[in-house]
């Protein structure tokens, strides 16, 4: 029968002590395989970055042109069915367009008051007297002459469906 003897062990305190670790040297056997990461030439990498940079520049320039071509969008009628233009006050630069979109499907149009447009502007050139009857029907007007343009919806003018475009 085997006997087990117990021994008293004292454990020192390790507060403030730092353990030192050393890695054992690696040993390779004759059958070890070493793989190396692929090497990328700096010029190939910078050429790729230049190409990506040019593509991003072209894409952002295109977006800016699209954004300036459609400077503002005005909903004809509110999301809740209210009669109005949203927003009712619009500011654009000369040469920019405003797109009017029928929001809910009530018949709407846009008529400019001939006494409330800049001198020399012919309202018949910018009025859209035909009704937009369906949701998402739209048209755009490009404003060339700086000034203030007051407009309204003919069937809903009495309900306060009016707006102003300010062209700088």
Curated annotation (Swiss-Prot):
Pfam families for this protein: Copper-bind
Domain Plastocyanin-like: 71-168
PANTHER family registered for this protein in UniProt: PLASTOCYANIN MAJOR ISOFORM, CHLOROPLASTIC-RELATED
Annotated Cu cation binding sites: 108, 153, 156, 161
Function: Participates in electron transfer between P700 and the cytochrome b6-f complex in photosystem I.
Higher taxonomy: Eukaryota, Viridiplantae, Streptophyta, Embryophyta, Bryophyta
Protein name in UniProt: Plastocyanin, chloroplastic
Principal subcellular localization: plastid
Gene that produces this protein: PETE
Entry membrane topology: Peripheral membrane protein
GO CC annotation, single: chloroplast thylakoid membrane
Transit sequence range: 1-70
Tree of life domain: Eukaryota
Gene Ontology terms for molecular function: copper ion binding; electron transfer activity
Cysteine disulfide partners in this protein: none
Subcellular location: Plastid, Chloroplast thylakoid membrane
Keywords on record: Chloroplast, Copper, Electron transport, Membrane, Metal-binding, Plastid, Thylakoid, Transit peptide, Transport
Protein family per UniProt: Belongs to the plastocyanin family.
Cofactor: Cu(2+)
UniProt cross-references to InterPro entries, sorted A to Z: BlueCu_1, BlueCu_1_BS, Copper_blue_Plastocyanin, Cupredoxin, Plastocyanin
